[in-house]
Amino acid sequence: MTYLFYTAAALAEIAGCFSVWAWWRLERSPLWLAPGFVSLLLFAWLLALVDTNAAGRAYAAYGGIYIAASLAWLWLVEGVRPDRWDLAGAALCIAGASLILLAPRGA
């Protein structure tokens, strides 16, 4: 369930941030901001649902999922294919996030 929350949170955060990007950098209508802010609220709520006793650990583990989702967004929404350096960097981050998320604790 944790991965589901992280993935949904990443999509909500990226969509929310992209709405600001679209308004500011792509000169889209300010109406883009309303669903963006709702999306950012959804992001925060979803991340708070992660089952952990330390917020910082949840955020650190989330980072790897966020990077992978950002590269998927880059490719699927923006039409820019990630290069080998993007993919290598994402692999390192996902490995680190997995270590944080799956490490045996309390031993």
Curated annotation (Swiss-Prot):
The chain crosses the membrane at residues 4-24, 30-50, 60-80, 87-107. The keyword Membrane applies. InterPro entries: UPF0060. It is a multi-pass membrane protein. SUPFAM superfamilies: Multidrug resistance efflux transporter EmrE (SSF103481). One of its GO terms (cellular component) is plasma membrane. Coiled coil: none annotated. It is found in: Cell inner membrane. It comes from the Bacteria. The keyword Membrane applies. Keywords: Cell inner membrane, Cell membrane, Membrane, Transmembrane, Transmembrane helix. PANTHER family: UPF0060 MEMBRANE PROTEIN YNFA (PTHR36116:SF1). Belongs to the UPF0060 family. This is UPF0060 membrane protein mll7841. It comes from Mesorhizobium japonicum (strain LMG 29417 / CECT 9101 / MAFF 303099) (Mesorhizobium loti (strain MAFF 303099)). The lineage of its organism: Bacteria, Pseudomonadati, Pseudomonadota, Alphaproteobacteria, Hyphomicrobiales.
